[in-house]
A protein has these predicted regions:
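Compositionally biased terminal segments of proteins
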Residues: 1-169
Length: 169
């Protein structure tokens, strides 16, 4: 983990490699998740930086167990075991930043009114380096980005423009 608390957001190439690495591990364990936040915006084609990987996850005990197993194997770290099954539902964001890595992963149970069950109704599977990544669809991603932060406003302009260009409702 970097001492400044920022993840691997400095380089788009490095971040893409991290996203692929994380999603490959999650897919191999059958974890139910959707990429949201800045990484989802990037995967939809907007060039921006982000310092973390945001994952909207199914908060069932079985799924959290699979997620923890995937991260233990990927990062060779027991730090993930500190996260309790109920944490995803209890906290707005559960942050995992393995000591040995320059990566920050935010696990989220709900963004506003959007939970995993809602998000999977509108996902786009984007393939990167042969790995299928479930990414939050445009309409749902727009809903999750209706915040007041300047970067959310920039993301919204891009997402709404892309949605209009593609003619999606």
């Amino acid at each position: 983990m970097r001492k400044d608390g920022k993840g691997n957001g400095g380089s788009r190439v490095e971040l893409q490699k991290e996203i692929v690495r994380v999603c490959k591990a999650l897919n191999s364990e059958g974890v139910k998740y959707v990429v949201v936040g800045g990484c989802a915006v990037i995967l939809h084609g907007y060039y921006r930086t982000t310092h973390d990987i945001d994952l909207l996850v199914d908060s069932s005990v079985e799924n959290i167990s699979r997620l923890k197993k995937a991260f233990q194997e990927l990062f060779k770290s027991d730090e993930i075991s500190e996260i309790r099954d109920a944490d995803i539902d209890q906290y707005a964001v559960v942050r995992f930043a393995p000591e040995s890595e320059e990566i920050v992963i935010d696990m989220i149970g709900k963004i506003g009114t959007i939970d995993f069950k809602t998000a999977i109704q509108d996902i786009e599977e984007i393939e990167v380096e042969g790995i299928k990544i479930p990414v939050c669809g445009l309409s749902t991603l727009i809903e999750t980005k209706k915040g007041i932060r300047p970067k959310d406003k920039e993301d919204l302009l891009f997402l709404i423009g892309k949605k209009e260009y593609l003619g999606k409702n």
